[in-house]
C-alpha cells in the first residue's frame, strides 16, 4: 500500500523568525552557512581554504561536540570531501527537480563513504581506532553548506517534516523536492525578503531548511512548561 504523508505548507512568518536572529546580530552563528556556501561558489579557492570554512561552519552548527568523532580531528580531514564536492558543483542551483535526485544521492553516497573510512582515537583508548559517527545530520549539513541541494536533516527538521526515525534516501528526497515545488511562490517571496535583509541569495533548499528547523524548534518549545517539564 502506498504511503501517504501530510501536506506541508511553508509560511513566511517562521522564515522571518529565523531570519531575525541574523538581522539582530550580524555575527550570529547562523551566518556561518553564508560564509561557507559563499566560499564554495568559487572552485578556484584552495582546498585548504574550503576545508577550513567547512570545518568552522560544522562547528558553528553543533557538529563538533558530544559523540561526533570529528571532534577529535583537525580541519584537514575535510579536504577529501572538498574534492568530492567539486565534482558535483553543477548541483549549485536555485531550484531542484526530480531529475536531480540521482546526482544528489550520488553526492550523499560518496560523502558518506569518505567519512565512514576515517578513524580517530580518544585519549582514554589511544591504541584502538574508532569509526566516525557518520550520521545523516552530518552529511546533509555538509551538502547544505557547500552545494545547497538538501536541508540539514537534524532532529528539529525531522520533527517538523514528519519524518522522525527516517533515514535520508531517495523517497525522502522526493518528498523534500515535492514540498519545495508545492511552496515555490512562498519560497520565492522568502528569497526576495532575505536578499533585502541580508544582501545574500539563499537557494530554495536553504529556505526549506530554515522554515522546518524553526517550526521544529518552536514546536519543541511549546511542549515545555515554565518549570522545564514536557507536557
Identify the function of each model-found stretch.
Residues 1-130, 148-231:
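An N-terminal alpha-helical hairpin/helix-loop-helix interaction module that forms a charged
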Residues 124-144:
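Helix-hairpin-helix
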Amino acid at each position: 500500500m502506498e504511503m501517504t504523508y501530510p501536506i506541508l505548507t511553508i509560511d513566511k512568518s517562521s522564515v522571518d523568525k529565523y531570519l531575525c536572529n541574523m538581522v539582530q546580530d550580524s555575527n550570529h552563528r547562523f551566518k556561518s552557512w553564508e560564509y561557507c556556501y559563499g566560499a564554495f561558489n568559487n572552485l578556484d579557492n584552495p582546498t585548504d581554504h574550503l576545508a577550513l570554512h567547512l570545518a568552522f561552519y560544522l562547528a558553528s552548527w553543533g557538529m563538533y561536540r558530544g559523540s561526533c568523532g570529528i571532534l577529535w580531528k583537525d580541519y584537514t580531514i575535510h579536504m577529501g570531501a572538498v574534492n568530492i564536492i567539486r565534482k558535483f558543483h553543477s548541483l549549485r542551483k536555485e531550484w531542484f527537480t526530480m531529475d536531480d535526485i540521482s546526482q544528489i544521492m550520488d553526492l550523499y553516497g560518496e560523502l558518506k563513504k569518505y567519512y565512514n573510512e576515517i578513524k580517530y582515537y580518544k585519549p582514554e583508548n589511544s591504541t584502538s581506532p574508532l569509526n566516525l559517527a557518520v550520521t545523516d545530520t552530518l552529511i546533509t549539513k555538509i551538502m547544505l553548506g557547500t552545494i545547497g541541494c538538501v536541508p540539514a536533516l537534524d532532529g528539529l527538521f525531522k520533527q517538523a517534516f514528519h519524518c522522525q526515525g527516517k533515514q535520508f534516501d531517495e523517497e525522502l528526497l522526493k518528498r523534500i523536492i515535492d514540498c519545495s515545488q508545492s511552496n515555490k511562490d512562498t519560497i520565492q517571496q522568502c528569497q526576495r525578503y532575505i536578499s533585502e535583509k541580508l544582501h545574500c541569495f539563499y537557494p530554495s533548499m536553504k529556505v526549506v531548511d530554515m522554515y522546518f528547523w524553526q517550526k521544529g524548534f518552536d514546536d519543541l518549545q511549546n511542549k515545555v512548561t515554565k518549570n522545564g517539564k514536557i507536557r
